[in-house]
Structure formats: C-alpha cells, structure tokens
Amino acid sequence: MVPPDGYDVAKPDQSTNDYSLFVKRAGDLFTVVLIYVDDILITGDNDSDIASLKTALHTKFTIKDLGLARYFLGIELHRNEQGTFLNQRKFILDILTDAGLTRAKPCSTPLPQHLKLSLTEGEPLDHPEAYRKIVGRLLYLTMTRPDISYAVQHLSQFLSAPKLPHMQAVTHVLKYLKGSISAGLFYPMQSQLKLTAFSDADWASCLMSRRSLTGYCIFLGHALVSWKTKKQSTVSRSSAEAEYRSMAATTSELLWLSYLLQDLSVPVTLFCDNKAAQQIAANPCFHERTKHLDIDCHFTREKIQDGFLQTAYIPSKLQLADLMTKPLSHDSHLQLSSKLGLTVFPT
C-alpha cells in the first residue's frame, strides 16, 4: 500500500520496524495508522487529521467507518476513564463450544504444576487434526492471555504425533479458560514512558532435548506490551548460560520496541534473577566458562556498553517472567498474572 501524504513508513535500514505501521507527526501531535490486510486501525491526538485521513482513503477506495474501535482482529476493546481493556472472550467461547466444554468444571491453572509429557508415552489420537486445531487457536489467544503462553508452547511440541495425554493436557487448558473466560489485559490511561523487561529461563527443562526455555515480559510503563515463551535453540551447559541466552532474546525485543518508540530516550531496564548471568553481561572479558557462547549472545553486553540497556537483579519470587517458563501453583500463578495486568474488566 502507498502511504497517504504525510505518512512515513520506517526507513529501509531499520529492518526491525513494523512496516504495517504508518505515522504522521505535526509538532507535538501525531496520528498512527495500523493496517492488517483490509482492516485498518487509526488513532492519535489530532481529530482533524484523523478525519482528513479517512476522507483521503475514501477517495481511493470504498471504506466502511465502524467508529470507535470495539473489535479488531478478534480482540474486544473496552474503555473507561482509567484505561483500555483487551480480551478475547467471544473467541474463547467459540473454542469451548466446538470442544463441547461450555459446562465443564473449571481448573485453577493452565496446566498441573508437575505435569510431565513425552513424545512416546500414551495412545496415539484417532483424530490428531482436532488437537492441532485447538493448539493453533490457543496460540492466537495468547495475544491477550499471557497466562497461557507456557502451556501453549509446551503443547505445541507434540503437533506432529499427538497422543492421549497431550489431548488431556489441552482439555485442562480449556477448563482453565472456562473459569477465566472474561479475563484480559488492562492498559492504564496514565503510564510512564519507560521500557522495563523481566527475563527468565528454565534450565534444561525439556526432557526430550534438554534445552532450556526462554521467557520474558516487557512493560511500557505499567502496561504489558510484549511477552514470549520459547525453547532455546542450543543446549546450555549451566543455568547462568541459559539465563544469559534469555537476556539476549529479551534485549533483541527491547531494541525492536525502541525503534517503534523513536522518541524514547530513557535507559531500558532488564530484570534478571540470576546474578551470574548478569555478571557475564557486564564483564567485557572472556573466560573459560563463557568463551563457548555464541557471539550473538554477547549482544546484551554490547547494548549495556552502548548505554541502551541497564540490568538489575530481582529475587526469583518477584520474577514476573517465571510465569512464562514453568507451570506454577494456583497462588503463584494468580499473583503473577495479576502483576502482568491480567484482570476482569469492571462492568
């Protein structure tokens, strides 16, 4: 799509930017256009510019103005004087209806705390496509439900040959969603313009490959804007190495977000609960325990030296990214979910 007059996409050398995002700045005012195929979301603090843009678009092709955004790409938007609430209640209800679980007894966590699944144990499913479909829909649901990110990542490992225990675990996730169907993310109206990240790793947690899990969550002020659970690509020889690799992945995401927030000039803080990994990031010297690490892992160290990033230690019990790397008890899961901004919109 050719951008309307005055709207600039990211520069070609900034390959990490989002090319579906168009921004127009006029002094202290700005207008933002986000495009996904034929769905367009417009926001900003200049009403006249927004009106002019819609008129300009309408001269090029037929558009349907749906007014104030209440539903976008399956995400429901609700507002009050405190902020904006995002959830996917209707999407969850559709999943539960298709699975025949609308009257199921709810579970208190996405997965049992000590669940162990393998590729080989259990009877193969007669209809594995049903498992794949549900997991795919759950993956889309993680856009507003970071509390199921670990569960979805874990269950995604068995898509090629799912077995009965895997389907039972998926059913457990759906029963959890049944009990929290109205939950979503709240974005407060007033929030400090500062990026803060929490990075965590679960060392050698994959029983099949002994690879570690990376988990992170990133806040803009008090608003959660990015999160991920992902298995690391190589086997780490220590918990410090696993944590350091997680810090590198988190730093990459922070850098991408900083490109989107080009006016952001304050230091970025990355919280880690492993002091050894934090010391590796701060120490410019190689030694026996770190010389085997890939060069790209030292990306974090470079960004610290550049002044882009500062790291800080946080006790494990306060590590918000813990939710992204392992199944937790009900109390811990509820506490961390709340701190991530997961709540039920007040009616």
Predicted features by range, described:
Residues 1, 21, 38-40, 53, ...:
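Mobile genetic element proteins and their domesticated derivatives, centered on retroelements
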Residues 137, 195-207:
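Two-metal-ion RNase H-like nuclease active-site motif
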Residues 1-62:
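Metal/cofactor- and membrane transport-associated sequence elements
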Residues 48-59, 123, 140, 154-158, ...:
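Alpha-helical coiled-coil heptad-repeat oligomerization segments
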Residues 16-25, 182-192, 256-269:
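A short glycine-rich, hydrophobically flanked beta-strand micro-motif that places a catalytic Asp/Glu
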Residues 1-14, 25-26, 103-118, 211-228:
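Reverse-transcriptase-like RNA-dependent polymerase core
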Residues 71, 194, 212, 224, ...:
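RNase H-like nuclease module associated with reverse transcription
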Residues 36, 65-184, 315, 323-325:
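C-terminal reverse transcriptase regions that engage the nucleic-acid substrate
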